[in-house]
Structure formats: C-alpha cells, structure tokens
C-alpha cells in the first residue's frame, strides 16, 4: 500500500477501526477522536453536530466529510477519490505529517502519523523511509512542502 497520502482505502480502514460496535456508523465522538489524532480537532461536539447535521455517519458520509471538510475538495459519493488541488488544502495535509513543525516530513514523522491513525501494524511493515526517498527530490532525507505538493498533484 502506498503511504504517500491518505487514500480512500485508508479512510475505509479508519472507519472500520472507529466503528467499534460494527453497526456501520461512526459517532460524532469517534469522529472527534480521529480529528484530534490528525490535529484537526478545532470544533466542540455541538459545533461538529451542526456541521455534520446528525449524530453519526455511515461510510459514504464519513468519506465525504473527510474530503469536503478536511481537505476542502469537491468529492462526491460517485467520485470520492479526489486529492486536493489547492495550496491551502495541501498545506493542511502537509502539516498533519510535519509533526514537529520544522517544515519537513521525516520517515519517523510519517510512521508516527500512520500509527496515530490506527495503522500500527502497517506502519511497521511499510518502508516509510523508501517513500520519503522516492519523493525527496533535493536528496536531503526529508520531504519539504514543495516535494509534498508535487507528490500530491502528480499521484
């Protein structure tokens, strides 16, 4: 699995992990938990309910919420595999992976974020260092914003 960005399949696995009672729904509390892990918990539960309009989301609604609200893209139910194409949305995604805020993504930061998202086993198996090397065009051992942006726009 390519770990260069959060894919729809990754989101499906996150949804399954969050759906602890396996009822096919993710509650607002579970949604707030994942937003907090991503560093995007800027809303109270009441505010989130106003945004979402209900107490829980099914898988399609969860995917749309992620792409519409988190990445500010125009994903739809039929075409949900959308990667944000504007600098602001890409910067927000970059900042999730740039854990220490130094302007660079290291293999360790990538691995840490994957683990925070509930992909502990996959993060150990994936070669995040190789992914960094593939997209590290200036060969400094990190992915900077421009390299990240080029990676996202050319996937």
Swiss-Prot record:
SMART domains: EFh (SM00054). GO terms for biological process: cellular response to hypoxia. It comes from the Eukaryota. Disulfide bonds: none annotated. Ca(2+) 1 binds at residues 19, 21, 23, 30. Ca(2+) 2 binds at residues 98, 100, 102, 104, 109. The keyword Lipid biosynthesis does not apply. One of its GO terms (molecular function) is calcium ion binding. Keywords: Calcium, Metal-binding, Repeat. Residues 6-41, 85-120, 130-155 form the EF-hand domain. Potential calcium sensor. This is Probable calcium-binding protein CML44. It comes from Arabidopsis thaliana (Mouse-ear cress). The gene is CML44.
């Amino acid at each position: 699995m390519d770990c260069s960005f959060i894919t729809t399949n990754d989101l499906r696995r996150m949804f399954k992990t969050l759906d602890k009672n396996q009822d096919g729904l993710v509650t607002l509390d579970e949604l707030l938990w994942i937003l907090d892990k991503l560093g995007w918990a800027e809303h109270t539960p009441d505010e989130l309910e106003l945004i979402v309009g209900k107490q829980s989301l099914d898988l399609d609604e969860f995917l749309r919420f992620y792409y519409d609200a988190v990445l500010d893209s125009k994903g739809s139910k039929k075409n949900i595999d959308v990667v944000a194409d504007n600098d602001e949305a890409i910067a927000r995604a970059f900042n999730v992976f740039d854990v220490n805020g130094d302007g660079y993504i290291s293999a360790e930061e990538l691995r840490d974020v994957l683990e925070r998202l509930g992909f502990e086993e996959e993060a150990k198996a994936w070669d995040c260092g190789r992914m960094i090397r593939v997209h590290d065009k200036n060969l400094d051992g990190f992915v900077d914003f421009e390299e990240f942006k080029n990676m996202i726009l050319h996937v």
